[in-house]
């Protein structure tokens, strides 16, 4: 079974190299053929060169909408299993082994636990973020940083809904759940805590309250979604290295 790893990226030169090294090292332990596609969304830095230096495929787009970027990667992919991994997310080999076992066991898709790197994050901010991730896991909602689906199920579900500029992974998860079993893996991925460092607690709370009050209309426009779309990046990668990374 060919596995396609799809990595959307916008100005990710700092973190992308370690993400790809770790992902490829983990994928090689599966003894399954795989491809990695970095979907470069009009980056102004060395994202494309970093991806090319890692020996993976690069798809150039100019979309500025994460659902559309992921869908573009899916259309370009050749695999029977589509795996969406954010450019700031490290995927351990045990997580990929769990994913493969779930799919071979009949799951149409799934996700994993999500942990933040936690470096330089205020303790209570990290606690709230981890609580949110735990609640999503308990509710079987996969984070967009790591989500997998059989191609047949992904296409039957309509892919990521491009009416939305955020929360698109939740809508896809609900659609996949109507087609079969959605597996939440006990293993985890490690994603960057940069948003917890680059945004104040007040900014994060205001963003969450805005979404809670306005609901779906709030995520149908890019305006007001600075938490996801303002493009802030850190100068160094502080994520702890994993095996192969």
Q: Predicted segment positions?
A:
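Cell-envelope/extracellular polymer assembly enzymes that use nucleotide-activated donors
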Residues: 2-4, 35, 171
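Short, well-formed alpha-helical segments that are part of the catalytic scaffolds
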Residues: 12-27
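A conserved acidic beta->alpha catalytic loop
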Residues: 22, 40-48, 89
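Acidic donor-binding/catalytic loop of UDP-sugar-dependent glycosyltransferases
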Residues: 46, 85-101, 174
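Glycine-rich, basic loop-to-helix element that forms the pyrophosphate-binding segment
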Residues: 61-77
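Short aromatic/hydrophobic "clamp" motif used to bind/position activated sugar donors
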Residues: 82
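Conserved donor NDP-sugar-binding/catalytic core segment of glycosyltransferases
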Residues: 93-121
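Acidic donor-binding loop at a coil-to-helix junction in glycosyltransferase catalytic cores
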Residues: 166-172
């Amino acid at each position: 079974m060919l596995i396609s790893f799809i990595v959307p990226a916008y100005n990710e030169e700092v973190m992308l190299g370690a993400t790809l090294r770790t992902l490829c090292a983990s994928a090689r332990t599966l003894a399954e053929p795989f491809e990695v596609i970095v979907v470069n969304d009009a980056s102004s830095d060395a994202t494309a060169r970093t991806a090319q230096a890692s020996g993976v495929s690069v798809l150039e787009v100019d979309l500025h909408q994460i659902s559309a970027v992921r869908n573009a990667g899916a259309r370009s992919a050749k695999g029977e299993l589509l795996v969406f991994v954010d450019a700031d997310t490290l995927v351990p080999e045990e997580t990929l082994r769990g994913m493969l076992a779930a799919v071979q066991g009949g799951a149409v898709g799934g996700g994993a636990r999500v942990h933040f790197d936690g470096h330089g994050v205020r303790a209570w901010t990290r606690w709230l973020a981890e609580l949110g991730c735990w609640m999503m896991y308990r509710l079987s909602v996969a984070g967009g940083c790591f989500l997998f689906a059989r191609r047949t199920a992904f296409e039957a579900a309509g892919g990521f809904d491009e009416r939305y500029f955020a929360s698109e992974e939740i809508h896809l998860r609900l659609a996949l759940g109507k087609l079969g079993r959605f597996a939440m893996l006990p293993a985890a991925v490690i994603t960057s805590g940069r948003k917890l460092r680059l945004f104040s607690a007040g900014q994060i709370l205001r963003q969450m309250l805005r979404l809670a009050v306005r609901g779906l209309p709030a995520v149908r426009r890019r305006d007001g979604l600075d938490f996801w779309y303002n493009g802030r990046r850190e100068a160094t990668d502080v994520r702890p290295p994993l095996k192969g990374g």
